[in-house]
Amino acid sequence: MTLMYDAIVAGGSITGLLTAREIAKKGNSVLVLEEGFEVGSPEHCGGLVSKSALNDLGIEPSVKSFDSKIESAKVFSPNGNHFSIDSTSQQIIVVNRRELDKQAAMQAQENGAEIIV
């Protein structure tokens, strides 16, 4: 038996899943191939993002995926120089990447994408 898809996405990380979601939204058949034993595992990077970036991507962090909010930070260089960042206007948040990836997978599937792990 031969299966045909309009698109095959290699990798079930946030980028691959959002790509699959957008392709599927247009009515195309999409297959996502993830090498891990489940979407979101292992985590590949931290989850420090702006709320506006998530909004632009069509993601509203669920309670499970939202860890905390960053209002300010001090950044230190190896030579001791440092500067402060006020991020209250940017709404910088820390998300649980595993849960955020699972949320993106659910969005992709709701739009018709298939995911194989």
Outline where the language-model segments fall.
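N-terminal FAD cofactor-binding segment of flavoenzymes
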Residues: 35-74
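N-terminal Rossmann-fold NAD(P) dinucleotide-binding loop
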Residues: 16-17
